[in-house]
């Protein structure tokens, strides 16, 4: 039995469910109504666009076009990470982009080439979905980690300088802040891994089962998706912090102004 298609009429009926959260958002005057409507509209337009684009990506199955698509995803993810953490693009755009690129390529290629043993590692059927899953799942944890790391450094500069003044290397002085970033960013992911299959069925597994794969195949893919996501997220963070530290600190170890200061409007 193949996957049951959702007609456009059925899709419209399904979208009516949004009226429930929209009602409560409006009723309690949260101020989120406009943002929710815009976000939903963007999601619909973007997904339809991606659906059309992916159709031709799979049809052409060209390695160069596939890799170009991954580069576009990395640039968008880097810009999103910078925007969500309020970090300066001039200083951190390259470290963040390189962190995404290196981790996604290394871990993604390891999975496709060594674990799946595909002859054509750039096959659109596997290359695009795997890299897309990695990018999507890495983004939130990396945003939390970057925000925690730089906010901690900015808030606890005296501790950082104290450690440097007492003979610690720059790497040793940064260790407490990296530790906090890892704890805050990866604790939810670890908790999610520990209850996988008991409390929640992940989207990848459900998608494969709906697509006709056996539960055993879907389970093994889901295991690997969690492993490669966890690994790529950690590798990306370490690469990013290592590269960013060269621009984030001056010759004396002082943190440069890497975060965009929010302007406070003065009252008339």
Predicted regions and their residues:
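C-terminal ends of transmembrane helices
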Residues: 21-31, 77-88
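Hydrophobic alpha-helical transmembrane segments of polytopic membrane proteins
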Residues: 216-245
